[in-house]
Each structure stands twice: as C-alpha cells, then as structure tokens.
Amino acid sequence: AADFVPGDILTEDIVPNPVGPYGESKIKAEEYILSHPAADKQVYILRPCMIHGPGNKGNLNLLYGVVKKGVPWPLGAFENHRCFTSIDNLCFVIKGLLVKEVESGIYNMCDDEALSTNGLITVICKALGKKARIWYLPKGLMNGMAKVGDGLHLPLNSERLTKLTEDYVVSNAKIKKALGIDKMPIRAEEGLTQTIKSFTNTK
C-alpha cells in the first residue's frame, strides 16, 4: 500500500505512506482489522508485492505483449530493482501460516530476489527464444523528453517515467523467520519464467 518508500528496502517497521485512494483504503482496512482483535484467532496481514502466475492479466502481461512485438525498451540506462511475488511462493506462505504456530501481525511477502526491469525483459525474451532489445539512451535525454510530455500531455511524462524506473525493494525476512525457512521455494526468475511461458501457451 506504500506507493512512496523512504530508504532502500521496505520493511514492516516503516510507516506506510500511501499515495491515492487505493493505497489509503488498504491501510484503513489494516487499521480496522488490527483494532478489532479476536482473542481466539490469529490475525495475519500479508503485504505482497506484485503477484503473478499463469493466466496473469496485469502489467506483466502488457509488458510481455510489447516485448513480443519486438518493441525496444528505451529505459535501459535506469537500473532500477523491483520485487515480485510468485503465486507458488504466496501459496507456500499461506499454507505455512495455516499449519504452523505463527504470531499474529503484518508480514511483507515477495520472492527472495529483486529484478531490474532490464532483467525482467531479459527473462521474457529468454522464454520467447528472442534476443532482448534494450536501448541505453542517456538519462538526461529521457528526463527531457518526459518534461516535454508533461506540457504536451504525451504518453511519456515525468510521473510515468518515475513509475517505470523507480525502485521497490521489499524485505521478506520477517515472514521467513516466522515460518522457520531460509529461502522461498521458487526463485524469482523461475517463477517469472513459468508465468511468461503460460502467456506463450495461450497466445
């Protein structure tokens, strides 16, 4: 729910700073649940990063479509990193919470490795059997084009450029410690490859 993340890595201890009604409503829901505890029940609030799996219909699917058409990624100079959540890892965690004695609380949920957008595009291309087309255009040029987009209301503007290039790295250390594990069962690249291959099987 925290669209703006102060610092390098988001942990459960960082006070959320949601931007917009979507994030704000999620925090309000968390506050309500935590303010009405049940004496005989455990309460878990999971904060997953972008969840993906076979049949995914979100932004990952859109990026896949762009890459499949051979459109170059022009923001290669921005080496950002973002965390994702494989549906297999999410199901593993939920099962663990159901069968183990885990303390109530808020838990971040994500795969162990953060990937750059360049890395994500490389994973998509590898699944497609294609060579990644990544352009490393100067950051100054892209920032300038985004400013022009602000004034002319073009698809690429400063806000969208920030969204496309910002970091969103999350710690899953708390949930792994609670479940008594050292790592998630599915690596980030493995899970993303499974998701991407599900797209190739349905197109």
Go through each PLM region and give its residues.
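Residue-level signal for the nucleotide or nucleotide-sugar donor/cofactor binding architecture
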Residues: 20, 82-88, 115, 170, ...
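Short aromatic-enriched loop/helix-cap "lid" or pocket-rim segments at secondary-structure transitions
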Residues: 5-8, 56-60, 119-122, 146-149
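Mid/C-terminal beta-alpha module of Rossmann-like enzyme folds, strongest
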Residues: 100-156, 187-188, 192-196, 200-203
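Catalytic helix-loop patch of NAD(P)-dependent Rossmann-fold dehydrogenases
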Residues: 6-52, 56, 72-75
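A secondary-structure boundary/capping signal
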Residues: 47-48, 111, 171
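Substrate-positioning beta->alpha
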Residues: 28, 56-62, 76-98, 104-105, ...
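A short C-terminal helix-loop "cap" of Rossmann-like NAD(P)-dependent dehydrogenase/epimerase domains
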Residues: 15, 64-75, 130, 155, ...
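Conserved C-terminal active-site "lid" loop/helix of NAD(P)H-dependent oxidoreductases
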Residues: 87, 122, 145-182
